[in-house]
Design a protein with these regions (language model features):
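Active-site beta->alpha loop and helix N-cap motifs at the rims of alpha/beta catalytic domains
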Residues: 2-3, 15-132, 145-147
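Short boundary motifs at domain starts and secondary-structure transition points
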Residues: 7-13
Length: 174
């Protein structure tokens, strides 16, 4: 199995890694959560930016991201989970990729979550920019209705790998 190293954390070897989310809606809630999580024994922190009430001001969110990263002494994963994949907010494809471009160019973090079924051109450009900025990509797909056949799951994981994901993730329901 291929390993992926983010700061001092190596995924794919040793013990399973623990990721703890930040899901505050306001700056104050997020700072409070980040200060607490900085003291917790976990490996990676995931900021679910789709919960953040001011996420649509992309530049300000990128600046705030720097503040959050500074509080944490752990690798930071940034995730905007779209509504169709179980997230909090609806966002057009164009705005999704614009947001990620701004965060990659202006923010401070280590990993970026990209959804497999977003438009291929935008996904490719986002992955390319992320890798230029030395960020790792977690590519994901969520099925809240069922567990697809094994062949479908393998096909999706292979597609993620072909697109350049560093880490491939599938989440399904029974």
């Amino acid at each position: 199995m291929k390993t992926v190293t983010i700061d001092t954390v190596t995924l794919g070897e040793g013990k399973p890694k623990i990721i703890v989310p930040l899901v505050g809606r306001t700056k104050e809630e997020i700072i409070q959560e980040a200060e607490f999580v900085a003291t917790v024994d976990c490996d990676i922190v995931e900021w679910r930016i789709d919960f953040y009430e001011d996420i649509f001001d992309f530049f300000a969110a990128a600046q705030f991201l720097k503040q959050v990263k500074k509080i944490l002494n752990k690798p930071l994963l940034v995730t905007f989970r779209t509504k169709q994949e179980g997230g909090e907010l609806a966002l057009s494809d164009e705005k999704y990729f614009e947001m990620y471009r701004v965060l990659l160019n202006e923010g401070s973090f280590d990993l970026l979550d990209v959804e497999l079924f977003m438009p291929a051109v935008g996904v490719g450009q986002t992955i390319e920019l992320a890798h230029e900025k030395n960020k790792k990509i977690i590519m994901c797909n969520h099925d809240f209705e069922k567990t697809p056949f094994k062949e479908v799951i393998v096909e999706r994981l292979c597609k993620m790998q072909e697109l350049g994901a560093d880490i491939c993730k599938i989440a399904v329901m029974p």
